[in-house]
């Protein structure tokens, strides 16, 4: 059935549902053969590979062995100067036998490009120009069938099924270490990327209390998981606390360690002590129904969940102390709910928000047009999207730029950032920390 992947447009997904005692058998009906790399591969851009190519052409003894020895020593990808603002990043895979190799990367067009084969060798490679401050997670997929004619959804499913971290990389994405092997990733973090990150535990930093529980909604007649965070030293008698409401609990309590980020920011005096509730999805299909400007879901948050939290915690009564946040569809939901209930939620922290969304093809960028046409509401925004995301009007980067223009035209308080990355939790973990500092500063 069609499902959305991480807030992207729907693509195919295989879902099984059966009683406990039912046996399911998969019977292949088509065999896809591995793709043999083209013999007329273009000359490599990488100076390192150009030198290797020349040495192989000269039949220099031991050239290939020495190359792989050096790669193992320094790790991958190769990073070589390109110009004042960019470097050439070359991903490598070692394979002599036929079979497609691809990069699983948080921007769609790169996933459609195969690794090239260096003639006369077992070197497969893909070179990309990147900004000198890029930070992007990635995986590699090998031994793939011929996917040249596959649509985007089929291609992504095939890449995910074969995905693995880069075996030659020395930089794992640390937040993925506890995940299943197929979900672990490597990290490109170039020299100009921010040195300070907030998503790793720090010594001697007090930790807040984290609790996971089920929450039932009468209005929606469903149940979901919540992760609740209370800051270190929480005193219900002493003060009233800001509230962060964050969507996609399965990712923002795991891929992005939100409690750790909050612990570190609070301890460093960057933000006020803040409570957080990370709201889970009912199931895989509910995300695409509830988060894209769903009035019933917004009503549940405003009339059920918020009062439920207020009864249990010492929360500020000020809408300006309540932040809605999420990535992709979660960023869209944050904007839509604040638009519907500005008297309850006063701030929006959007990470690569899917503002291209419309209820149908005739109404693209629906939320952008609402803010552009309506009166200014008592809201403040932090918008962040990646330079590797789609710049077109119906893409993430393009629609975020459209929303920026609409908000600026109305005079909304706005922090706007374009980060050198893609649709990627490795980037969003940094951007979440930036947004919290912008919207809930300690001073």
Regions found by a protein language model. Name each.
Residues 5-25:
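Noncatalytic modules at the cell exterior or secretory-pathway interfaces
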Residues 7-11, 34-36, 101:
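N-terminal accessory segment at the very beginning of proteins
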Residues 17-21, 29-31, 141-145:
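Beta-strand-rich extracellular modules
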Residues 21-42:
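Exposed low-complexity, polar/acidic, P/S/T/G-rich flexible segments that act as propeptides
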Residues 39-111, 118-443:
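Non-catalytic cap/lid and distal C-terminal segments of serine-dependent acyl enzymes
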